């Protein structure tokens, strides 16, 4: 099994787009890219827009040779109804989606999911609601969790987690569980016993606003418990990498991981490149070059449609 992170915060954009290849199938998870509409009171910098354009093209090219596309929920850094990445990426694919009508918040149920499904009409070979189901392709098994909250409560909706198992082991893609602050986030991890996990981490950059100290502590303790249970790799990247203080936030997890021989890294480090935290450094980018970005029309529509 081969895991390739395609777009993450450590690669310069808001995303968790990932390619997983087994001898049976090529699976593209959450093919979307986005930017923070405002950060530190500032709009996206031109470097962020350029990086988004680059990674969107990369996802588009890779999509041509995949068999399966998975959408874990309907936030714009995890799905794209054609704003930035052409909807044609779904042509002739098998598409597994988060249930668009059950265990879902209102903005996704009544706006985002219906818009996405209308855009997909007649394009994929098949669309399958995946919540709580398993699918077998040769010696590869796709195991989907039931819907779990996007973080400590349901305000941001629900997501589905994905386990991919073959003879080499099991990869777990947690989607946006915000570092697993709830026990039900851990249930799926215990069920599938992954040796490789891709997890988003807590919303620590919003501590005191969208994240309480109590829930941050729960996330850290639960991530510590995850790395104690047979892991080899943990890519922790997405929400937590929007925080300039992410090293201190993740320090307890990394210390436990070291004791258990687990490698905890960002998507960029996994690929062998330097992390490029453009959003977290947006203030510094504008200090170096203080001019607003030229926003392409599709990206403008995406940013206008709401934050992630």
Swiss-Prot record:
Signal peptide: none annotated. InterPro entries: Metallo-B-lactamas, RibonucZ/Hydroxyglut_hydro, UPF0173_UPF0282_UlaG_hydrolase, UPF0282_hydrls. Belongs to the UPF0282 family. HAMAP family: UPF0282. This is UPF0282 protein STK_23220.
